[in-house]
């Protein structure tokens, strides 16, 4: 939709919301990590880059989803504990935003239940009105996975997969948070070797 809008001369921020029923889905949220990577230890810059990028294709919670993930990855350069990173990122979200209320709810569910499955079932019920590709319920899944992963890469991937929803997008973002925070040694070789040290990208050249 955003590409079509741009081709028709509709530029950001209008390109993100005009004729766009997917404006608050996960398409921008899944791009957040790269903005955090290029702004190590500078969550404000990461947030600004993410906001600029997200408003091309999304609006409202769709934008804040990218900001949230960018902030978490940026914080990973200066904080090693995933649970602390999540809490810090939540505190940086606008207090009056719907997105903040969702990630705050997810955090409180984790605190209340003390176990990932109960916490996730609570969130899943609370946000069942949303499409499974919407940014908000997937943000809750990220919070639950990072909260209970105990800084363990295998456990993190298992938890985020068990939550369901848009699993590949969520896994990519939270795995990046942990990898930055804990370093490459946190990832077992069995996750890396099948790729044969090769990356396929859409980027030309």
Describe the residue ranges of each PLM region.
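Hydrophobic, membrane-interfacing alpha helices
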Residues: 26-28, 62-64
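Short, conserved phosphate-binding/catalytic loop or strand-edge motifs used
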Residues: 45-53, 66-67, 195
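Catalytic phosphate/nucleotide-handling subdomain of diverse soluble enzymes
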Residues: 58-61, 67-74, 144-205
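Accessory "access/gating" subregions that flank catalytic or transport cores
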Residues: 2-23, 32-42, 51-56, 70-164
């Amino acid at each position: 939709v955003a590409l079509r809008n741009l081709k028709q001369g509709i530029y950001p921020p209008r390109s993100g919301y005009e004729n766009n029923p997917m404006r608050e889905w996960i398409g921008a949220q899944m791009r957040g990590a790269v903005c955090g990577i290029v702004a190590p230890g500078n969550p404000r810059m990461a947030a600004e880059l993410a906001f600029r990028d997200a408003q091309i294709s999304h609006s409202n919670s769709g934008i804040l989803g990218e900001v949230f993930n960018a902030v978490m990855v940026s914080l990973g350069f200066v904080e090693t504990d995933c649970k602390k990173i999540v809490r810090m990122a939540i505190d940086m979200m606008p207090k009056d935003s719907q997105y903040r209320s969702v990630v705050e709810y997810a955090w409180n569910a984790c605190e209340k239940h003390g176990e990932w499955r109960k916490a996730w079932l609570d969130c899943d019920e609370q946000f069942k009105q949303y499409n499974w590709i919407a940014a908000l319920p997937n943000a809750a899944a990220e919070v639950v996975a990072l909260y209970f992963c105990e800084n363990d890469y295998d456990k993190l991937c298992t938890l985020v997969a068990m939550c369901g929803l848009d699993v590949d997008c969520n896994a990519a973002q939270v795995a990046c948070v942990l990898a930055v925070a804990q370093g490459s040694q946190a990832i077992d070789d069995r996750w890396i070797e099948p790729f044969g040290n090769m990356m396929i990208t859409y980027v030309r050249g």
